[in-house]
């Protein structure tokens, strides 16, 4: 892990809130240092500032020990196998290196023996990132790191909306995993690590689309109560959608280990005055009259450090009859 072990953040998640967080990994790869353009990977086209500089693993690298050449060659091969874009990998490792060793920010590492220890530390950071990205992002997600942007996020939002799921639910799922990995993360969206968050969003959208993290609640004929259950790994979550009517009374009861979950209830059409009925709450119960007709989203995410089992009871009643679903729910585009 690049950062301390997970402890549940006492904050509200959601992409809008992410933009307000403070800096996680300061610095950039703009200044760079000699190692990242010369002795790490053969793909970089920049001219080396030292005449002795050659590619890793080459017989013409007399200033690197055989062990160092082998280490760098292994990093290169592993990065390529994982499909992680070169420049993103450099930027990500650089940002972490500068964060850990800020005294190195204004100097250029050389290929000499005096910087052997610093090169070793950079390589160790790069290896940590390869481990983390392999374990927590899909191959498809990894291949796009460094290229995610606002246009992608807008497209993901539209795709989630087609499932009657809003961006808040999607980002809740991503935040749960991201903050498990980086509990101190702040103001990261424009930093290299922000690409990791967006990669997680991409994977969570796929999980919604394949149904592994999404379930539409259907009431059996003549009933108004639904018992749901499941197991969540650390950083996992699940979205439940239910097509309900304005004026109905919704009651939720979540049975899970203490302080191990966050619960949200999102509206069919969120507004600035009423964006949610419940958001990122450690509460395990909620009840109230529904203000709108359409698809409501109930999101359960795990903040635990080990797998948990949970049961969710969803009860809807009406003064005259059992729940009546609207014949024509709102268009998916009503979500945001």
Where does each model-flagged region fall?
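Hydrophobic residues positioned within well-ordered beta-strands of beta-sheet architectures
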Residues: 228, 240, 250, 310-314
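Membrane-anchoring helices that localize proteins to membranes
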Residues: 8-47
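N-terminal edge beta-strand
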Residues: 217-238, 243
């Amino acid at each position: 892990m690049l950062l301390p072990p997970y402890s549940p953040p006492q904050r509200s998640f959601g992409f809008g809130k992410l933009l307000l967080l403070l800096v996680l990994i300061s610095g950039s790869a703009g200044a760079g240092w000699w190692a990242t353009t010369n002795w790490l990977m053969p793909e970089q086209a920049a001219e080396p500032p030292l005449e002795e500089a050659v590619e890793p693993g080459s017989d013409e690298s007399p200033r690197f020990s055989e062990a160092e050449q082998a280490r760098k060659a292994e990093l290169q091969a592993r990065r390529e196998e994982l499909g992680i874009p070169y420049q993103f990998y450099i930027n990500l490792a650089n940002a972490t290196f500068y964060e850990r060793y800020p005294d190195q920010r204004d100097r250029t590492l050389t290929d000499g023996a005096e910087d052997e220890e610093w090169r070793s530390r950079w390589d160790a950071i790069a290896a940590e990132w390869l481990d983390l990205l392999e374990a927590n992002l899909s191959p498809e997600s990894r291949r796009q790191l460094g290229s995610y942007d606002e246009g992608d996020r807008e497209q993901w939002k539209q795709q989630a909306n087609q499932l009657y799921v809003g961006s808040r639910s999607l980002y809740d799922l991503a935040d749960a995993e991201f903050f498990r990995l980086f509990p101190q993360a702040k103001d990261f969206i424009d930093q290299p690590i922000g690409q990791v968050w967006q990669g997680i969003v991409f994977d969570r959208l796929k999980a919604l689309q394949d149904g592994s993290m999404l379930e539409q609640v259907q009431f059996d004929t003549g009933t108004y109560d639904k018992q749901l259950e499941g197991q969540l790994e650390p950083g996992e979550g699940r979205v439940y959608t239910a097509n309900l009517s304005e004026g109905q009374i919704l009651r939720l009861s979540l049975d899970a280990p203490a302080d191990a979950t966050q619960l949200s209830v999102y509206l069919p059409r969120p507004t600035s005055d009423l964006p949610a009925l419940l958001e990122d709450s450690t509460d395990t119960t909620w009840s109230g009259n529904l203000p709108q007709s359409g698809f409501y989203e109930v999101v359960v995410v795990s903040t635990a450090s080990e797998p948990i089992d949970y049961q969710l009871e969803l009860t809807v009643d009406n003064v005259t009859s059992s729940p009546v679903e609207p014949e024509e729910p709102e268009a998916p585009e009503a979500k945001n």
